[in-house]
Amino acid sequence: MLRRSILISGISGLAAFSGLALAQSMSSSSAEKAMPYSRRPEVKKFIQDVCKRRGLDQNWVAAILDQATYQPKIERLMTPKRAKPGTKDTRKDWEKYRNIFLGAHRLNLGVQFWKDNEVYLERAREIYHVDPAVIIGIIGVETRYGENTGSWKVLDSLVTLSFDYKRRADFFKKELEEFLVILYNNDLKPFEVQGSYAGAVGLPQFMPSSIKRVRADFDGDGKIDINHSTADTIGSIANYLS
């Protein structure tokens, strides 16, 4: 019961900050969206700059980007819904979010996850001085302990948000650059990687720049896997927060 109470407190605090409003998008022209990405002037410059900075092959990067498909739904999802004058505001308040994040199913999953991973959680506390309840709360809020890590193709997400969602293009271009480096260094096929519509991946829903910066091989198997390894996920979150 103590762990359940601590978990409720941890998730409540995290979920309260999760409802940040996302800025409205500014769409590119239809003509641009119908064109292969590598032929668009803005993308050509991006390719040149990234390859110069990171030592990647321009033809390889262009070929990867041309496999991406513009996703209009992602633009819609990134745009907050605002109530029209005279209509009811349907945005969720804390009470509605509380029912989502503190339901019995999620809490039971959290308690079991804590039991199953207690060794790694205590190691994270010792090494990074991060309370296990905070780590548990983050994984619960982000992916429901791995039940929903996202089904969007991350390449589609990041390319759409870099070149067709102008309001936050600079941020997503940096994430796309890091994603391309991850693909190149790990010999991954672009559509093998799935995640959220914003391009976050794995149990902790890290953006590519965070993966590079804080990833931790916490189970000592020589690999860092935040998609399947709860140990690596715990270590990486703790490293991120330390």
Descriptions of predicted regions:
Residues 15-19, 147:
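A generic secondary-structure boundary signal that marks alpha-helix termini
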Residues 34-69:
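N-terminal mature-domain "stem" immediately C-terminal to a signal peptide or N-terminal signal-anchor/transmembrane
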